[in-house]
Structure formats: C-alpha cells, structure tokens
Regions:
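Bacterial N-terminal signal peptides
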Residues: 9-22
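Short nucleic-acid-contacting surface segments enriched for D/E, G, S/T with interspersed K/R
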Residues: 82-97
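Short boundary/loop segments of OB/S1/cold-shock single-stranded nucleic-acid-binding domains
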Residues: 24-38
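Conserved hydrophobic positions within beta-strands
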Residues: 42-44
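Short aromatic-glycine-enriched beta-strand elements
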Residues: 50-60
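Short, structured beta-strand/loop micro-motifs enriched in basic residues and often containing a Trp
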Residues: 74-82
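OB-fold/S1-family single-stranded nucleic acid-binding modules
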Residues: 103-126
Length: 134
C-alpha cells in the first residue's frame, strides 16, 4: 500500500513540475527589428513601473497633426534603478525625445533605448538587440 501511495505522490510531483515549466519562460526579442533605431519626440501619457517590464506610453504628433500612441518597454524596476531610473521620473504631459528599437510589424511598439528628459538629461535604457553571432 505504501509503495502505491509513493508512486502516486511521485507521479503527482512530476506532473506539477512539468506544469510549472511555462512559468519560467520569458519572451525573446525576435519581434524587435534588431539594429533599427527610430528617434521621435512625444508627450508622455503614462509611465508604468512594474515587473516584469516598465513601460513608457507617449503620443507623437506628425506634421499633419495626426497623433500616434506609442508604448515601449524597458527592463524590470530593479535593473532600471541600477541604471539611474525611478518610479516618479516621468509625469503625464512631459515632453521627451525617445529612441526606440521598433517591432518588425510596424506597430507603434518597441524597446526603449534612450530618452532625453525635459531637463535635457539623457537616460539609457538598454542596448539594442544583436543579430545572431557568426
């Protein structure tokens, strides 16, 4: 009887461990257009300071007055703190200059590389993704 209980327990443990594997997953950078950089000026609408990534949302107005809403990601808060960033560094309405690595599909989404704050200070978020090694 105890062998049967042990076998059931072992099977349940293996099943739970297998079911938990997706929790350890993380998205890659295949969606980003590696090496491409786009610079723009915009108005901050929201700064989201949260795990697993922080997000900067901002509006960019083109020469015709059309507004495009961008959302770009950075790293996690602890990493951003190490880079000198903070939870309260952006306020809605802040005018910023942003350099992003956009996604390949052309949507207004990307990885934030650099931002020039309203006070003129440049903050670096990340290095652009690199292509495969030769």
């Amino acid at each position: 009887m105890t062998n049967k209980i042990g076998a059931v327990f072992a099977a349940a443990l293996v099943w739970l461990m297998a079911a938990a594997v997706p929790v350890w997953g993380h998205h890659g950078s295949a969606a980003f257009d590696a090496g491409k950089q786009v610079a723009m000026k915009g108005t901050v609408t929201q700064w989201t300071w949260a795990n697993p990534h922080c997000f900067l949302s901002y509006d960019v107005k083109d020469d015709s007055g059309n507004v495009t809403h961008w959302v770009v990601e950075t790293s996690n808060p602890p990493d951003m703190i190490n880079r000198g960033w903070s939870k309260g560094m952006f306020k809605p309405g802040d005018e910023v200059s942003v350099t992003v690595e956009p996604v390949k599909n052309g949507k207004p989404v990307g990885r934030l590389l650099d931002v020039v704050l309203p006070n003129g200070k440049t903050m670096h978020s990340a290095s652009p993704a690199r292509g495969p090694a030769n």
